[in-house]
Swiss-Prot record:
Chief place of localization: mitochondrion
Record membrane topology: Peripheral membrane protein
Assembly notes: Complex I is composed of 45 different subunits.
Transit peptide, residues from-to: 1-33
Similarity field: Belongs to the complex I NDUFB2 subunit family.
Keyword Nucleus in annotation: no
Gene: NDUFB2
An example Gene Ontology CC term for this record: respiratory chain complex I
A single GO BP: mitochondrial respiratory chain complex I assembly
Compartment(s) where it occurs, according to its Swiss-Prot or TrEMBL record: Mitochondrion inner membrane
Pfam families membership: NADH_B2
Protein name in the entry: NADH dehydrogenase [ubiquinone] 1 beta subcomplex subunit 2, mitochondrial
Region (Disordered): 85-105
InterPro entries: NDUFB2_animal (IPR026627)
Amino acid sequence: MSALTRLASFARVGGRLFRSGRARTAGDGGVRHAGGGVHIEPRYRQFPQLTRSQVFQSEFFSGLMWFWILWRFWHDSEEVLGHFPYPDPSQWTDEELGIPPDDED
């Protein structure tokens, strides 16, 4: 019985798709088609007019980008600077540092 209910629901969805495709070609489906031309006309040598939403989104994503870059640089700086061991000054000898021996006066 469950196979029949699945088959019936599949047929119902298929019928809806078929009807919506037929209505779309007739213009009854509520689909709005653009009426030719571009929506925002390009202007020669002028900046495009941005909406407040576009300005907000660009500032948000640029702030997020800089946060991510600075966060990664602060916490994983060896990824940028390299994986070189930092020299330990306690292992250097006086001779390597150019310090004369104590007995010379």
